[in-house]
């Protein structure tokens, strides 16, 4: 799923004639699931890594995780060096981002403000849809079609 998310980020940005390389991405959430501080085996970490490797400038906001390691195995054995520090969510960070990427749907994110201030939003958790927030600047993952339909 991380590769699909990163590819979709590229498609969304291409829609405004912008490349993923050099774009500013604001990733909201790094933990494994909402409202916890555990990021072990979180696909959000892999998404962060892939975005970085694609040349995007990524800021991460997560009110539950203050610092994370891309390679947790290295952190366990002391080989990781400094971790990636998350930032507090501010209106300035939202406004500076070319794309806001919601990867963990924490309860305390101000979703209405995010949707109003962001240039583009890619909501992988349906956090905005759940709150009935809609806009032509909000993108979601395609809903898979059941083979039984």
Where in the sequence are the language-model features?
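Structural/interface elements that position substrates and couple domains in central-metabolism enzymes
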Residues: 1-149
């Amino acid at each position: 799923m991380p590769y699909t998310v990163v590819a979709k980020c590229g498609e969304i940005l291409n829609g405004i004639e912008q490349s993923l390389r050099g774009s500013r991405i604001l990733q909201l959430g790094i933990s494994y699931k909402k409202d916890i501080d555990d990021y072990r085996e979180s696909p959000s970490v892999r998404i962060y890594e892939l975005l970085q490797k694609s040349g995007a400038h990524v800021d991460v906001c997560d009110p539950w995780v203050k610092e994370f390691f891309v390679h947790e195995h290295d952190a366990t054995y002391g080989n990781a060096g400094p971790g990636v520090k998350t930032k507090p969510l501010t209106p300035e960070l939202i406004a500076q981002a070319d794309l806001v990427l919601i990867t963990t749907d924490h309860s305390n994110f101000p979703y209405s403000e995010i949707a109003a201030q962001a240039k583009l939003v890619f909501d992988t958790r349906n956090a905005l849809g759940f709150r009935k927030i809609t806009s032509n600047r909000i993108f979601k993952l395609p809903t898979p079609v059941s083979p039984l339909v």
